[in-house]
A protein has these predicted regions:
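Scaffold signal of the M16-like zinc-metallopeptidase fold and its non-catalytic homologs
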Residues: 164-181, 185
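Extended, domain-scale alpha-helical bundle/helix-rich regions
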Residues: 180-209
Length: 209
């Protein structure tokens, strides 16, 4: 959140390139048009109009869900992520760090490639669930003149009825629902080790699968 002004400047650069626009379509209409590979009327606006609306957008003049910033991608692409995905949305809730300073917040596919480049990341390791998003993120990097990273993707092994997401686990631990990262009811490596299951057992299991 400390880089919001930088993210705003990159968003404005996309608008000036005529590669992003403010869209006022409701969620249902947007989903329907994207599904059918059709453009909405908002896409046809002039750059100067989008810049004016972007200014109002970041000043918080729109309600939540009233407007979003979308990338001009390829509405006929077989990869639906490329069909004018949302880059920014309005969120009025108070931010734990920035308070009420910002009202327009970036989506994952926008801030992720920018932050990776700003931090000098050269290698990305992530699970295959993000595979469809690589095309959009590389497209953004090309438009914004950002460095690309080498990406290594891997399969993900899930255990039914258990969560392995760090954010969710942290919240449950902080709320007191679980005693800690080694709570035997969890399936973290620490918890499994406490139950006598060593990490090498999972390496062998994955090999067999």
């Amino acid at each position: 959140s400390d880089d919001m002004e930088i993210l705003y400047s990159y968003a404005e650069k996309l608008i000036n390139l005529d590669k992003a626009y403010i869209c006022f379509c409701d969620r249902e209409k947007m989903q329907d048009l994207r599904h059918n590979g059709k453009e909405c009327e908002c896409r046809k606006k002039k750059v100067k109009d989008n810049l004016k609306e972007w200014s109002d957008f970041i000043k918080g003049k729109y309600k939540e869900g009233e407007a979003v910033l979308r990338i001009k991608g390829d509405m006929k692409s077989n990869n639906h992520v490329m069909r004018d995905s949302v880059l920014f949305r309005i969120m009025k809730a108070q931010h734990y760090r920035q308070g009420n300073k910002y009202h327009a917040w970036p989506m994952y596919d926008f801030y992720n490639p920018i932050e990776d480049s700003l931090m000098g990341v050269t290698l990305i390791l992530r699970s295959n669930e993000f595979d469809m998003r690589v095309e959009l993120q590389d497209y953004l990097k090309d438009l914004l003149g950002l460095n690309k990273q080498k990406i290594i993707q891997y399969g993900r092994f899930n255990v039914m009825e258990f969560t392995t997401k760090g954010r969710e686990l942290r919240e449950m631990i902080e709320s007191g629902e679980y005693m800690g990262w080694d709570d035997p009811r969890l399936i973290t490596l620490k918890a499994l080790k406490r139950r006598g299951i060593v990490k090498e057992s999972f390496y062998e299991l994955v090999k067999q699968i």
